[in-house]
Regions:
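Extracellular/periplasmic, surface-exposed regions of secreted and cell-surface proteins
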Residues: 1-174
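Short helix/loop capping segments that flank catalytic or ligand/cofactor-binding pockets
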Residues: 10-11, 182, 263-265, 272-274
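Conserved small-residue
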Residues: 13-18, 27, 123-241, 279-295
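Flexible glycine/proline-enriched surface loops and loop-helix/loop-strand junctions
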Residues: 44-47, 234, 246
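Active/binding-pocket-proximal capping segment
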Residues: 80-85, 94-96, 268-272, 279-285
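Conserved C-terminal beta-signal and adjacent last beta-strands/turns
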Residues: 133, 242-270
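Short acidic/glycine-rich loop or secondary-structure boundary segments that cap or lie
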Residues: 145-146, 271-275
């Protein structure tokens, strides 16, 4: 077993400074009142955070390593837990600060990672000149945000112009994995105009386009607390999955014959989702509108 503590800065020393920039395009004023000339001024280009500090990770583990059957099998098992405090993230600034300042990195969350890692190695001979080595690896992982800064219910990352209905696809909230996907649940496609007319009001609804679930009025377990409001808006967004895999594993096979060897490797990742941003441009309204009428 073991215990250890590590720090991670993840930010440059410049993060503490508030910066100002000048430019006629962003800050100007006709100070002489002639309406024919403009004086260049300064504007805040980045908000500083002098209170930012290193992330701190505390890891504990226990495990064993065993050789079996005269060394033919090597088994390694490890159980571990990693608590990370003062996670550094760049979060949007309040609108009262304007649209120009870049956000600083701030310490905003604590996260838990825990899991089990297993490795089994089998070595043997196929003949006098041939031998093999087979390695199986597997890792089970649980990831969860356990706390946020006071006054913060959640924070989102990702830019609005690259996701469904111009809203962030990623939300970080207590009880969910880091960078969990958050958006609208797709029920299918509108087959015809009759389905569009019968469905809740939805921006850009039309035959051949995605149909979203009206889940407003339901709790996280999808129990109905009150009737749906009959429209698709931000209150219908929900958690769609995690980018963090629940299991990762692999198989490695190496065969040696004399002075030649052949090696192959298979890897798998299970239990996680991926966000295919190219689909935003090809499948989703409003970046993709499709044909309004059939030919």
């Amino acid at each position: 077993g073991g215990w250890g503590q590590m720090g991670n800065s993840r930010i440059s020393a410049e993060n503490q400074f508030t910066l100002f920039s000048g430019g006629l395009g962003e800050s100007y004023y006709d100070i002489n009142g002639t309406n024919t000339s403009a004086a260049e001024g300064f504007y805040k280009s980045r908000e500083g955070n002098p209170d930012a500090k290193w992330e701190t990770s505390e890891t504990t583990n226990i495990g064993f390593d065993a050789l079996l059957l005269n060394g033919r099998f090597d088994v390694i098992l490890e159980l571990w837990r990693k608590n990370t405090n003062d996670l550094l993230f760049t979060v949007p600034l309040p609108q009262v600060l304007g649209s120009y300042p870049a956000s600083p990195a701030v310490n905003i969350a604590s996260m838990l990672n825990e899991g089990i890692d297993l490795q089994i190695v089998n070595k043997g001979r196929l003949s006098d000149k041939a031998r093999y080595e087979l390695t199986l690896t597997g890792g089970w992982l649980h990831n969860e945000i356990v706390s946020l800064a006071p006054g913060t219910d959640y924070f989102e990352t990702g830019t609005g112009g690259t996701n469904r209905l111009s809203q962030s696809p990623i939300r970080n909230q207590i009880g969910y994995s880091i960078s969990a996907f958050y958006g609208y649940e797709v029920l299918g496609l509108f087959a015809n105009q009759a389905e569009v007319d019968a469905a809740p009001d939805q921006e850009g609804a039309g035959p051949g386009r995605f149909r979203y679930a009206d889940i407003h009025g339901m709790d996280p377990d999808r129990k109905l607390l009150r009737p749906p409001d009959g429209k698709i808006d931000a209150s219908d967004r929900t958690y769609l999955g995690s980018p963090v895999p629940k299991f990762m594993g692999g198989v490695n096979l190496k065969v040696v014959f004399g002075s030649f060897d052949v090696e192959t490797y298979i890897y798998t990742s299970l239990g996680n989702k991926i966000f295919n941003i190219s689909k935003w441009y090809t499948d989703f309204y409003p970046s993709f509108t499709g044909a309004t009428k059939s030919a």
